[in-house]
Amino acid sequence: MSDGDGGGEQGGGGPAEAEESALVLGRLLDRGAWRLKVAGVEKPRRDARLLAGHVLGLSPGAVLLADDRVVTPEEAQALEAVIARRETREPVSRILGHRGFWRFDLALGADTLDPRPDTETLVEAGLAVLEGCGGRILDLGTGSGCILLALLADRPGAIGLGIDIAPGAVRVALRNARALGLERRALFAVGDWAAAVAGPFDLIVSNPPYIPSADIAALEPEVARFDPSRALDGGADGLDPYRILAAQVPALLAPAGVLAVEFGQGQARDVAGLLEVGGLCPYEIKKDLSGEERCLLARRRAAGPLPPIHIDAKPSAPGNGPTKA
């Protein structure tokens, strides 16, 4: 339905008809999408529909078929409120309070990073490490628990510990574990990286902050304003967390254990170098679906020279089910 001029009163209708026309969902979506477009939102129509579905309790498909639906004044007011929030560039996932990741719908909080589809590359790499076995998993900087919970869901014999410095993030991760029925195999605790953790672990995973401090202000508003800064800020060069991991992880890995870490664009060689200095042997780099180098795997160093790092020729395959917007 287009914005148009309405036309209701010109056809002889009275004030009641005009008021009803103003509450037709299609018209509200047109106006909402226009406002979001002006605000610089990348996909204004899609986001307006998602928000309408949230307010009205409708699936995205049902919203597409509901242009002629007349909403109540209360529903129109609620839709106006969430459109106004999205106008500020608050992400839809933050407004809804949840985000699709792997094949789950996970709760978010003010202290958790909004999980990205690219991070599913890290999950796929971890699952390959644990192929055919259980294992003990440590997730450093767990946030919403998305990585650890995805690994545990697909490796029923595994158990895991997630650490985050933010108590609010730990509470969200616990909530997600309970919602997925994984609370018996997933423990979460507040901690400063692995400072108070005892190993050994068969797999250690981390998606640490890796944005250089000076670059954060230039990120999309959805990220710079609404993701917690401590989940983004990797220090002056974006590599401070990897220095911590390089110092702490070797002592926590089992003899055949593996560290899998996510990193930012152009950071692969620097991250590999830091891990080598810490006593690890980086052996493989995984690419995400867009073809960007995204994930590095390293193991405890054996005697002798370091072998060359293998780089995937192709991006990793999609995970178990599409990532939901």
Curated annotation (Swiss-Prot):
Pfam family, one: PrmC_N
CDD domains: AdoMet_MTases (cd02440)
InterPro entries: DNA_methylase_N6_adenine_CS, HemK-like, N5-glutamine_MTase, PrmC_N, RF_methyltr_PrmC, SAM-dependent_MTases_sf, Small_mtfrase_dom
EC nos: 2.1.1.297
Region (Disordered): 306-325
Function: Methylates the class 1 translation termination release factors RF1/PrfA and RF2/PrfB on the glutamine residue of the universally conserved GGQ motif.
The family this protein is said to belong to: Belongs to the protein N5-glutamine methyltransferase family. PrmC subfamily.
Protein name per the record: Release factor glutamine methyltransferase
TM annotation in the entry: none
GO molecular function: nucleic acid binding; protein-(glutamine-N5) methyltransferase activity; protein-glutamine N-methyltransferase activity
GO terms (BP aspect): methylation
